[in-house]
Amino acid sequence: MIARRNPEPLRFLPDEARSLPPPKLTDPRLLYIGFLGYCSGLIDNLIRRRPIATAGLHRQLLYITAFFFAGYYLVKREDYLYAVRDREMFGYMKLHPEDFPEEDKKTYGEIFEKFHPIR
């Protein structure tokens, strides 16, 4: 079993997650999760042997809203975890610059072969 990095009690979103910008409401991940909510409403109708697309439109809207709301916080948590990982990685790179030497920048002329048109 892997031990947690810090002994702080487990929280879904710590206070330092508030400093990050919120996810956009048109984020494709949120739209996908909302679509999953719509599909779950359709599957619910299918399981209960109701007309699939037309029965319980209010229920389908509730599923979409609930999934979108839960997805918003899941995306926010994912962004926070990526930010923590990036902070640790860049901190390590700053403390150990000898492990990450600067590479010489090449021009496009050095990368690509010379072009000779053939007619």
Curated annotation (Swiss-Prot):
The lineage, from the top, is:
Eukaryota, Metazoa, Chordata, Craniata, Vertebrata
Q: Where in the cell is it found?
A: Mitochondrion inner membrane
Q: Name one GO biological process term.
A: mitochondrial electron transport, NADH to ubiquinone
Linked pathology: Mitochondrial complex I deficiency, nuclear type 36: A form of mitochondrial complex I deficiency, the most common biochemical signature of mitochondrial disorders, a group of highly heterogeneous conditions characterized by defective oxidative phosphorylation, which collectively affects 1 in 5-10000 live births. Clinical disorders have variable severity, ranging from lethal neonatal disease to adult-onset neurodegenerative disorders.
Protein's name according to its UniProt entry? NADH dehydrogenase [ubiquinone] 1 subunit C2
* Gene this protein is translated from: NDUFC2
State the family it belongs to.
Answer: Belongs to the complex I NDUFC2 subunit family.
Query: Membrane topology per the record?
Result: Single-pass membrane protein
Q: Does the keyword Ligase apply?
A: no
Report quaternary structure and partners. Answer: Complex I is composed of 45 different subunits. Interacts with TMEM242.
Q: Which GO terms describe its cellular component?
A: azurophil granule membrane; cytoplasm; mitochondrial inner membrane; mitochondrion; plasma membrane; respiratory chain complex I
**What's one Pfam family here?**
NDUF_C2
Q: Which residues cross the membrane?
A: 56-75
